[in-house]
UniProtKB/Swiss-Prot annotation:
Pfam families: DUF4504. Coiled coil: none annotated. This is UPF0739 protein C1orf74 homolog. InterPro entries: DUF4504. Belongs to the UPF0739 family. It comes from the Eukaryota. Signal peptide: none annotated.
Length: 263
């Protein structure tokens, strides 16, 4: 793909994602957002959670159409609304990812506030959530039957969903956090050493790399989760080799301890 000029990418975002008299996101945010969209289109990540402004699904659709006019491969991308949040997803890639989740490709970490420390759990221990994954897959399969729109939009009802876990799997995290909602949103991660993983990849010349992933796992569970994390890294590196828009994938980790962790 021939990369549009940074000026055109910034203009596309600022013309469509501004609300009222406010302009769209700042220049650096506009360029990073375009890189994330391209990463979703190329299958390097299944989805991105839009949090650059208060723009809703119609504005995000307009933005993606604007990018398409600049030569971006946005046809087939979809704006998925969940509980007042908008995600830009590639339905086919997300569906494949969720099907792998059902096969046990990822682990979950229970961080319920009632526990003294985090614990690994499997999808089989989260039967309600397993049914939810099936529901999302069914929804995405319906979307793939309608290719009439370049960029489509839909909404998923989510009144009783654990959004922390839902977003974790949709964004492609290999080890999402989960917790028992009937015990509130408190968690047991405060003052717990966390290993934070960050994956970045270069795109535009003379611009900072695009942040593909950022997630954490409790350091106490790192050894038991290492195989899943290694598989995730290997898969990401394989996908990066199948495209030509990005280069120089970098995956790093650091250990942090925080007084409180918001999920």
């Amino acid at each position: 793909m021939s990369t549009p000029s940074p000026q055109l990418l910034v203009a596309a975002a600022q013309q469509t994602l501004g609300m009222g008299k406010r302009r769209g996101p700042p220049r650096a945010v506009c360029l990073h957002l375009a890189g994330e969209v391209l990463a979703v289109a190329r299958g390097l990540k299944p989805a991105l959670l839009y949090d650059c402004s208060s723009a809703g699904a119609p504005e995000i659709q307009s933005y993606l159409e604007k990018l398409r006019g600049l030569g971006f491969p946005t046809q087939g991308l979809h704006v998925l609304e969940i509980a007042e949040n908008s995600l830009i997803v590639h339905p086919e890639y997300v569906r494949r990812h969720l099907e792998q989740v059902l096969l046990g490709s990822i682990a979950f970490v229970d961080v319920s506030g009632s526990q003294p420390y985090p614990a690994v759990c499997s999808l089989d221990q989260l039967q309600d959530f397993k049914a939810l994954v099936v529901e999302i897959i069914t929804h995405l399969q319906g979307l793939q039957r309608d290719r009439s729109l370049a960029v489509s939009c839909s909404r998923l009802c989510s009144s009783a969903w654990n959004l922390c876990t839902v977003f974790g799997i949709l964004l492609g995290y290999p080890v999402p956090y989960t917790f028992h909602e009937n015990q509130g949103e408190d968690n047991c991660l405060a003052q717990t050493p966390l290993r934070v993983f960050t994956a970045r990849i270069s795109w535009l010349c003379c611009q900072p790399p695009v942040l593909l992933y950022s997630f954490s796992v409790p350091e106490s569970l790192f050894l038991s989760l290492r195989d899943i994390l290694n598989t995730w890294e290997k898969d990401l590196r394989t996908r990066c080799r199948t495209q030509n828009d990005f280069a120089d994938l970098s995956i790093s980790s650091e250990i942090v301890t925080l007084p409180a962790v918001a999920l």
